[in-house]
């Protein structure tokens, strides 16, 4: 550094002694450009030298907090980011005494980054040359960022109580669910700008901030998994038995569904709080109006009966509307229908006829429909981001992207899902049990994909599980199914995870079973499993030979994908009142 200073001193003296006005114009420009460049280089070197000097004069790497931080970050996918983000916090050494402290600090730093992104998006919305879809996509980003902030705050609160208040396994599943959803939200924001080249300049303006938050969430998730896995292993070893809560079941229902909610889902006589009737005979004429009038943040079940009729509207159950239940008069009689789609300027996220985010949502005896048709591309009938949500005796009908299982824990039982391309997709931990899943006739040249699962990180506790169900074709596809190949799924994201087990698969499914997304993308990192399926399309001898595909022969391995294990079903499904099975 001293030599650089000496050089610039001599250079400055030389330029002062020489009459610059005598230098030819072209040489003068070259001289000034060179001088400016060297100044920048010197400044950069000075900054780096200063940082190194501070590092050398400060923490020598032998301090206890340094070892804890380094050890914690070693379990992450982005250890350098993990370490540098926390090490940059003033007086970090006084705050880090355990891995739990490292995780909490990481969550707080991530929250600050998310808030920064929020303000950046608000600034972008002020641009005057935005297209319709860009505006919609930016509002999607504001919504998902708002949800991310809630998830991070909940994670910090849950972490502060860890390992008390709840069982270890419940703590682990709740924390991993929150961080998995927070990660998913970042990708959802960027996905809204991927429909055409015209809106990618806006995506570029957002990308760095969203990807940074996604990586920070990934690091927190990895550390949470490492901490909870270690603690649970210690408990199992010390008790010499499995954790009690891991084997608990309630009549085959996940335990997060209370006995009361189980009755609500199965009972033929339920007293609603309000009634929706298109003919004016109820409290409201539209479903959206009934939701808007529902109490916010409710801890008690709020029941909305939707009488027979066709309701042409788009409905959003926001995060503020918790524990809402829709009860229809029958899946062929109560129909909520819309036609938003990507071709006409919507995003996939906003195209949903019904979108549900409020925790604890239940629905039974209703059809959710999007009538946009196969030529309109992505057009969602039902989007679900509500944690601990369940659907019973419902139909989801559309073409491309019918059912968007966006995030969090979800359960579908006795439902019909019909569509064409990627018609069950998203990154929730979703189990579909005893459902009818039917491919429809697509446009000429299209292939049908039953699933497109969006797991983007190996530590996310997400995936799509289809159990004890029936996979077939609708009446319009059956006569021509040879012209429209149908597959069980393709990998939307790098760590896509889908399991089909104990189900009946007809010959509508191509012998290869699964299809690529784009060349070799994700073929080594995905997890696609099949277990004890039957039917003309269930044979596995002709299946793909990808590293990520496997035929599951072990009942123990398959058990991990049942509702009791995969969506912590023993702690909540009992409350829905819907029929279900927790195990194999």
Curated annotation (Swiss-Prot):
Please indicate which residues carry the site annotation Transition state stabilizer.
400
Read off the Gene3D superfamilies from this record. Invertase/pectin methylesterase inhibitor family protein, Single-stranded right-handed beta-helix, Pectin lyase-like
Q: Where does the entry say this protein is expressed, by tissue?
A: In the peel, expression is localized to the region of the flavedo close to the oil glands, and to the innermost layer of the albedo. In the lamella, expression is localized to the cell layers opposing the fruit tissue, and to the parenchyma surrounding the vascular tissue. In the fruit vesicles, expression is restricted to the peripheral cell layers and stalk cells. High levels of expression are detected in the core matrix.
Q: Report the GO terms under cellular component.
A: extracellular region
| Disulfide pattern | 415-435
Which controlled-vocabulary keywords does the entry list? Aspartyl esterase, Cell wall, Cell wall biogenesis/degradation, Disulfide bond, Glycoprotein, Hydrolase, Secreted, Signal
- The principal localisation class reads secreted
Localized where?
Secreted, Cell wall
**EC number(s) recorded for this UniProt protein:** 3.1.1.11
Question: Which positions does UniProt annotate with glycan attachment?
Answer: 108, 129, 226
Q: In which pathway does it act?
A: Glycan metabolism; pectin degradation; 2-dehydro-3-deoxy-D-gluconate from pectin: step 1/5
Q: Which reaction does it catalyse?
A: [(1->4)-alpha-D-galacturonosyl methyl ester](n) + n H2O = [(1->4)-alpha-D-galacturonosyl](n) + n methanol + n H(+)
SMART domains assigned to the protein according to its UniProt record, in alphabetical order: PMEI
Q: Where is the signal peptide?
A: 1-50
One MF annotation (Gene Ontology) recorded for this entry: pectinesterase activity
Please name the Pfam families in this protein's record: Pectinesterase (PF01095), PMEI (PF04043)
Query: Which GO terms are recorded in the biological process aspect for this UniProt protein?
Result: cell wall modification; pectin catabolic process
Q: Locate the residues binding substrate.
A: 348, 378, 490, 492
Q: Name the PROSITE patterns on file.
A: PECTINESTERASE_1 (PS00800), PECTINESTERASE_2 (PS00503)
Catalytic residues identified in the record: 401, 422
| Propeptide feature ranges | 51-266
Per the record, the similarity remark reads:
In the N-terminal section; belongs to the PMEI family.
**What is the purpose of this protein?**
Acts in the modification of cell walls via demethylesterification of cell wall pectin.
Task: Give the free-text miscellaneous remark of the entry.
Answer: The PMEI region may act as an autoinhibitory domain and prevent untimely PME activity during transport.
Kindly provide the name given to this protein in its UniProt entry.
Pectinesterase 3
Can you name the source organism?
Citrus sinensis
């Amino acid at each position: 550094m001293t030599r650089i200073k000496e050089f610039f001193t001599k250079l400055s003296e030389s330029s002062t002694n020489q009459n610059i006005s005598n230098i030819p114009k072209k040489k003068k420009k070259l001289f000034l450009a060179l001088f400016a460049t060297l100044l920048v280089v010197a400044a950069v070197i000075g900054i780096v030298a200063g940082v190194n000097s501070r590092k050398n004069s400060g923490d020598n790497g032998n301090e206890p907090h340094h070892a804890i931080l380094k050890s914690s970050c070693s379990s992450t996918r982005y250890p350098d980011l993990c370490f540098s983000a926390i090490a940059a916090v003033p007086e970090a050494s006084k705050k880090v005494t355990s891995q739990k402290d490292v995780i909490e600090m990481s969550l707080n730093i991530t929250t600050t980054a998310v808030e920064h992104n929020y303000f950046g998006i608000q600034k972008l919305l002020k641009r005057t040359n935005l297209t319709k879809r860009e505006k919609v996509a930016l509002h999607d980003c504001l919504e998902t960022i708002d949800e991310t902030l809630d998830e991070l705050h909940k994670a910090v609160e849950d972490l502060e109580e860890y390992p008390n208040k709840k069982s270890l396994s419940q703590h682990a599943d709740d924390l991993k669910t929150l961080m998995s959803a927070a990660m998913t939200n970042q990708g959802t924001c960027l996905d809204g700008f991927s429909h055409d080249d015209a809106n990618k300049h806006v995506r570029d303006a957002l990308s760095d901030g969203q990807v940074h938050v996604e990586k920070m969430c990934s690091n927190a998730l990895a550390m949470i998994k490492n901490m909870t896995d270690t603690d649970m292993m210690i408990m199992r070893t010390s008790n010499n038995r499995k954790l009690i809560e891991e084997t608990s079941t309630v009549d085959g229902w996940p335990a997060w569904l209370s006995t009361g909610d189980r009755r609500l889902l199965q009972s033929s006589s339920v007293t609603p709080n309000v009634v929706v009737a298109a003919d004016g005979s109820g409290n409201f004429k539209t479903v959206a109006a009934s939701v808007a009038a529902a109490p916010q943040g409710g801890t008690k079940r709020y029941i909305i009966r939707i009488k027979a009729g066709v309701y042409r509207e788009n409905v959003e159950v926001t995060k503020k509307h918790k524990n809402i239940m829709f009860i229809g008069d029958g899946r062929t009689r109560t129909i909520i229908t819309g036609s938003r789609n990507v071709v006409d300027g919507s995003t996939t996220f906003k195209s949903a006829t019904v979108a549900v985010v409020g925790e604890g949502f239940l629905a039974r005896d209703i059809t959710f429909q999007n009538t946009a048709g196969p030529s309109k591309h992505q057009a969602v009938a039902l989007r679900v981001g509500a944690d601990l949500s369940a659907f019973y005796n419902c139909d989801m009908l559309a073409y491309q992207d019918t059912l968007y299982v966006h995030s969090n824990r979800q359960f579908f039982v006795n439902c019909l899902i019909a569509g064409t391309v990627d018609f069950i997709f998203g990154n929730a931990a979703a189990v579909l049990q005893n459902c009818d899943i039917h491919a429809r006739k697509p446009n000429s040249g299209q292939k049908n994909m039953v699933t497109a699962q969006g797991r983007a990180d190996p530590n996310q506790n997400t995936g799509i599980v289809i159990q004890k169900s029936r996979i077939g074709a609708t009446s319009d596809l059956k006569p021509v199914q040879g012209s429209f190949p149908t597959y069980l799924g393709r990998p939307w994201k790098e760590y896509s995870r889908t399991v089909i087990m104990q189900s009946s698969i007809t010959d509508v499914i191509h012998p290869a079973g699964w299809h690529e997304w784009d060349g070799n993308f994700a073929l080594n990192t995905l997890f696609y499993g099949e277990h004890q399926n039957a039917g003309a399309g269930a044979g596995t001898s002709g299946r793909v030979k990808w590293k990520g595909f496997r035929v599951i022969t072990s009942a123990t391995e398959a058990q991990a994908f049942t509702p009791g294990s995969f969506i912590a079903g023993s702690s909540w499904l009992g409350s829905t009142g819907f029929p279900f099975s927790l195990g194999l």
